[in-house]
Amino acid sequence: MKKHLSLLVLILLIGFNYTQACTNFLVTKGASVDGSTMITYAADAHVLYGELYYTPAMDYPSNAMVDVIEWDTKKLLGTIKQVSHTYSVVGNMNEHQVSIGETTYGGRPELSNFHSGIVDYGSLMWLALQRAKTAREAIKVIAGLFDEYGYYSSGESFSISDKNEVWIMELIGKGEGQKGALWVALLVPDGYVCAHANQARITTFNYQEKNDWFNESQTVFHAPDVVSFARAKGWYSVKDKDFSFSDVYAPVSFGGARFCEMRVWSFFKDVNSKMGKYADYASGVIKHGKNEFAKNRMPLWIKPDKKVSAQDLMKYMRDHLEGTDWDMSKDIGAGPWELPYRWRPLTWEVDSVVYCNERATATQQTGFSFVSQSRNWLPDPIGGIHWFSVDDANTTVYTPMYCGITKVPESYAVGNGDLLTFSWDAAFWVFNFVSNWTYSRYSYMIKDVRVKQQAFEKKYAELTPVIDNAAKTLYAQNPELAIEFITNYSVNTANNLVDDWRELGEFLLTKYIDGNIKKEKEGMFERTATGYPAGPDQPGYPDWWLKKVVETSNGKFEVKGAAH
């Protein structure tokens, strides 16, 4: 009984959603190297298949309805009114360069509404992308949808960007039987970066008398009852100006800090040298102050020491806490080959003491991830690039998908395989083949993966201005030709990448099979003068690992006579 109680208490203290754990980084125009706005999103779930969603622009009759299918389960939740025109959406970016990502934080369990609500968090994202030309309009659409039809999910953080602005929006339901949601949306100040990773991060904010949606000077929107609802529940009783959304509706716990805010901190400390002072907080040390709110939290947004590029964000999405006290490659759990991953569960118990593994940004169970880049100096179909990838961000390649494309590559298309159906033609399975083989001898194989990964992403970065300029010239003459051009480029680039990555997998299997390492010379495996394979390298285990084996084996491996 004691064991069961301790695990129950742990779950309550952690307050962490194990099924859907994601990471978002947000970059404003003034914080990016070229004036882009950018957001990232890693969709991490153990049952999520990585594929590139696409819906074309459509016109509908006045009486049209649309089914709402829950993203997580594919369950039909209900039907809602369709609008007269929807915009095309590739992945999580629409034709007007609006992009949306999310992370689930859960929050107070009594505020979930899984019976009377119709619209889940996934549907909110894609319905908003189909209906909004700007980030502000997307927030308005989201709020209107859950007010009219009810919110079906638990607490969510959204990243919402367009070619000029970046917003963070956090919401949570009102509990069973109540429509609407409690929410706040804040404009990230220009020149700053923000992040969220499964822990609500909005604390205090400037209360507004009304949501004046198209007033460009208004930088805060929120539910009118976001404070009064908490008062009525007895969860908050002091001044409105001190009200903290997160501390009331989703208080940070050990798990919220260690498994979630740790990822935010790791990004922040990589872009700002002053963020080291929040290491204790990120490790799970929560200090409480006024109103019992956490007083040692990180700021919601920070100014980076230097401006950030899309390629920088790709690197930050590959983080395993390297160089910190929580570096996942440096303890015994990494094994002899410094593997920066730990298989689930996140927590485990020995002699009635509960321990945890780290939860880094890069993780094995990523279905897909992206870096969305919106550029206001180009026509919309060309200005938006959805840098898309499947599987673990650490071992994948971000390939460019211009937001104006009219089809997606077959290797990434919906229906090409699924999580239970292997396909050599599917990007998800090809990248998983490489990553999962790499995990088996990580410190060696990751070097080969990095060479290819960096070569592809460097080439794509160098080609981008060339493709941009060619597409822009075509667009001035004939927009349809420009869209055909960027579609062909995006599709062919991605399909060719998958073919090349499949070859990388074959190379890695050949080179590292059976624990050996084949010798190479001038890009070819070595053979003897007679054409026979050269003897492989067998570097053995590192000394520190061998010492651990000796320490824990009670002398049973000691050689006490001739070894052969």
Set out the residue ranges of the language-model regions.
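Bacterial N-terminal signal peptides
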Residues: L8-G15
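Histidine-centered catalytic/metal-binding microenvironments
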Residues: K452-H564
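Short, well-ordered beta-strand elements within core beta-sheets of diverse protein domains
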Residues: M125-R131
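Substrate-recognition/cap regions that form aromatic- and gly/pro-loop-enriched pockets
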Residues: A334-T473
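A contiguous strand-loop segment
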Residues: C22-Y121, V141-V308
